[in-house]
From Swiss-Prot:
Protein name in the entry: PHD finger protein 21A
GO molecular function, one term: zinc ion binding
Classification via InterPro entries: Zinc_finger_PHD-type_CS, Znf_FYVE_PHD, Znf_PHD, Znf_PHD-finger, Znf_RING/FYVE/PHD
The protein's role, per its UniProt record: Component of the BHC complex, a corepressor complex that represses transcription of neuron-specific genes in non-neuronal cells. The BHC complex is recruited at RE1/NRSE sites by REST and acts by deacetylating and demethylating specific sites on histones, thereby acting as a chromatin modifier. In the BHC complex, it may act as a scaffold. Inhibits KDM1A-mediated demethylation of 'Lys-4' of histone H3 in vitro, suggesting a role in demethylation regulation.
Subcellular localization(s) per the UniProt record: Nucleus
Coiled coil regions, renumbered to chain: 571-609
Upper lineage: Eukaryota, Metazoa, Chordata, Craniata, Vertebrata
Subunit and interaction comment: Component of a BHC histone deacetylase complex that contains HDAC1, HDAC2, HMG20B/BRAF35, KDM1A, RCOR1/CoREST and PHF21A/BHC80. The BHC complex may also contain ZMYM2, ZNF217, ZMYM3, GSE1 and GTF2I. In the complex, it interacts directly with HDAC1, HDAC2, HMG20B/BRAF35, KDM1A and RCOR1/CoREST.
In-chain residues carrying the UniProt-annotated modification Phosphoserine: S456
Organism for this UniProt entry: Mus musculus
One example of a Gene Ontology biological process annotation: suckling behavior
Biased composition (Basic and acidic residues): 336-354
Disulfide bonds: none
Length: 688
């Protein structure tokens, strides 16, 4: 019963494991799922260990009961193989749909397994190792009724082809079984021993899938999803017996960037390139060495040959036909005063290439492996991989100062194109858009260190001193019209020449940013000691800009730079205007605030003055009232005084006895006006 409970627990854990594997396929980068998967694997491993111990205990109990008769008959090997083949054609049922077998049958299987292990001869068991299959796999996951084979199988059967491959191990490690082990049929109902020389003891426990494949029945393969953990947890096996992985494209070859369509299948047409006539005065060295360079299918072959001091004329003709099989060398004619034509043949030149000094190109640095479909897709979109980006960034340092001693100068494939001048389009004889930098491989040239004018044919100046040093003629087949050799400015990526515009020699040259001319630092007037930083314009372009005689064909990058400079200038001007406007507004605001302060102070002063004026007005009114009263008093005093004077005068005239006269009694009483005046005078005196 303990074995049955362990099997049920393993069944549940395996179902959960399969669900986790399905989730991991949808989201392989989820860390939580990985953690749960590792924990579940640890649980399954622990349960399998417990089951192993229970099986070993049952095996010991069965060994004690060896005297009991065997309840199952061992069938021959051929019958078991036939049953294996017929049973493997049936699909595997899910784990939850299979019926568990009885514990009595499991005990019988353990008993049978113990008897088989006891019946094995010592010669076989000493040299063979066992592969233990947990009984949970057989009783719960496989609906196959397969009989076990005898351990003492004949040796002739061992050499046959494998019949079964059995598969998933602990921690998702695949069990590697040799062909001899696979030849012996596996008893899938019992924990049997599969004997075979060279097979190591591996405990196979189903963690996520069980795969059975037979080569004889390929039409119905059994596909069960599998999950492969990270490489640090699963060491990759050296040999997988019946597992055939999906063929992977070979990507261990360094992948070069996809060439343009015109370079996909270059064909070398019969085209004599140039006839160069050298004199001893034009050769710089005393040995008169000529270094011709031939480019065939992207490989360079440099040949150095020494000639005596004599006038030399040679013609180099490419072989007619299609693409050449391998790199070929150029034959140089012997020194003579007559013209000699040399044709290169593949058979003869292969023998001569061994004796000549061929300088192969340097071995390319190993690049990162890339998918060719991915590269083609990126190239079609105009994208660049990391390796090509590093190449472009490293080659940007060579832009200002590069050596042109080697005429086969190849630049970056993905470098942005620049505009071509009208002269370049007129001199170009090839279809534009074939190469970025350097010379195309279909032109073969014998180049010397003499004065060579690449852009102008010699017939235009027959009497010039340069024509005496260099004579260049071109011969083409009959239907083709004779044209001039394409100048170094005929390529799209680099519109600059390869020779100094002053001395007509190669070397370390400084390129003008506005035209195709190049100069030595020493040939300039005044000569430069270091490379100038930023944009450099040659003297001729400076003169043209000053005179405004011709329109200079600006390259695209320079036009972008100038437009950006103009844009920045406009932005700066607008910024300055806005700053000035803001400063003016701030100043005006400050002035207004000052005016507000002044007005507020003046208003406060006015209010104070108003209050003071009102107070003074009140005081003045009170004082005016007092003055009016005083005036009234003064008027009242003046009215009372005449009456008193008359009375006193009458009294004096009457006599000293002051008796009034007789008619005094008859005088009327004083008028009320006089009485009022006296009253007022009395009041005025009282106020005083």
């Amino acid at each position: 019963m303990e074995l049955q409970t362990l099997q049920e627990a393993l069944k549940v854990e395996i179902q959960v494991h399969q669900k986790l594997v399905a989730q991991m396929k949808q989201d392989p980068q989820n860390a939580d799922l990985k953690k749960q998967l590792h924990e579940l694997q640890a649980k399954i491993t622990a349960l399998s260990e417990k089951q192993k111990r229970v099986v070993e205990q049952l095996r010991k109990n069965l060994i004690v009961k060896q005297e009991q008769p065997d309840k199952f008959q061992i069938q021959p090997l051929s019958q078991s193989e036939n049953k294996l083949q017929t049973a493997q054609q049936q699909p595997l049922q899910p784990l939850q749909q299979q019926q568990p077998q009885q514990p009595q049958q499991q005990q019988q299987q353990q008993q049978q397994h113990a008897q088989q292990s006891a019946a094995a001869p010592p010669s076989l068991t000493a040299s063979q190792k066992t592969v233990t299959t947990a009984s949970m796999i057989t009783t719960k996951t496989l609906p196959l009724v397969l009989k076990a084979a005898t351990a003492t199988m004949p040796a002739s059967v061992v050499g046959q082809r494998p019949t079964i491959a059995m598969v998933t191990a602990i921690n998702s490690q695949k069990a590697v079984l040799s062909t001899d082990v696979q030849n012996t049929p596996v008893n899938l109902q019992t924990s049997s021993k599969v004997t075979g020389p060279g097979a190591e003891a591996v405990q196979i426990v189903a963690k996520n899938t069980v795969t059975l494949q037979v080569q004889a029945t390929p039409p119905q393969p059994i596909k069960v999803p599998q999950f492969i953990p990270p490489p640090r947890l699963t060491p990759r096996p050296n040999f997988l017996p019946q597992v055939r992985p999906k063929p992977v494209a070979q990507n261990n070859i360094p992948i070069a960037p996809a060439p343009p369509p015109m370079l996909a299948a270059p064909q070398l047409i019969q085209r004599p390139v140039m006839l160069t006539k050298f004199t001893p005065t034009t050769l710089p060295t005393s040995q008169n060495s000529i270094h011709p360079v031939r480019v065939v299918n992207g490989q360079t072959a440099t040949i150095a040959k020494t000639f005596p001091m004599a006038q030399l004329t040679s013609i180099v003709i490419a072989t007619p036909g299609t693409r050449l099989a391998g790199p070929q060398t150029v034959q140089l004619s012997k020194p003579s005063l007559e013209k000699q034509t040399v044709k290169s043949h593949p058979e003869a030149e292969e023998k001569q290439a061994e004796s000549r000094t061929v300088t192969p190109p340097a071995a390319p640095k190993p690049k990162r492996e890339e998918n060719p479909q991915k590269l083609a897709f990126m190239v079609s979109l105009g994208l660049v991989t990391h390796d090509h980006l590093e190449e472009i960034q490293s080659k940007r340092q060579e832009r200002k100062r590069r050596t042109t001693a080697n005429p086969v100068y190849s630049g970056a494939v993905f470098e942005p194109e620049r505009k071509k001048s009208a002269v370049t389009y007129l001199n170009s004889t090839m279809h534009p858009g074939t190469r970025k930098r350097g010379r195309p491989p279909k032109y073969n040239a014998v180049l010397g260190f003499g004065a060579l004018t690449p852009t102008s044919p010699p017939s235009s100046h027959p009497d010039s001193p340069e024509n005496e040093k260099t004579e260049t003629t071109f011969t083409f087949p009959a239907p083709v019209q004779p044209v001039s050799l394409p100048s170094p400015t005929s390529t799209d990526g680099d519109i600059h020449e390869d020779f100094c515009s002053v001395c007509r020699k190669s070397g370390q040259l400084l390129m003008c940013d506005t035209c195709s001319r190049v100069y030595h630092l020493d040939c300039l007037e005044p000569p430069l000691k270091t490379i100038p930083k930023g944009m450099w314009i040659c003297p001729r372009c400076q003169d043209q800009m000053l005179k405004k005689e011709e329109a200079i064909p600006w390259p695209g990058t320079l036009a972008i730079v100038h437009s950006y400079i103009a844009y920045k200038a406009a932005k700066e001007e607008e910024k300055q205007k806005l700053l000035k406007w803001s400063s003016d507004l701030k100043q005006e605001r400050e002035q207004l605030e000052q005016k507000v302060k002044e007005l507020s102070s003046s208003i406060s002063k006015c209010m104070e003055m108003k209050s003071s004026i009102l107070a003074r007005q009140k005081e003045m009114r009170s004082s005016l009232d007092k003055v009016k009263r005083l005036i009234r008093l003064v008027h009242g005093v003046d009215l009372c005084r005449p009456v008193d004077s008359e009375a006193t005068a009458g009294a004096l005239s009457n006599g000293p006895d002051c008796t009034p006269p007789a008619n005094a009694a008859s005088t009327p009483a004083p008028s009320p006006s006089s009485q009022s005046c006296t009253a007022n005078c009395n009041q005025g005196e009282e106020t005083k």
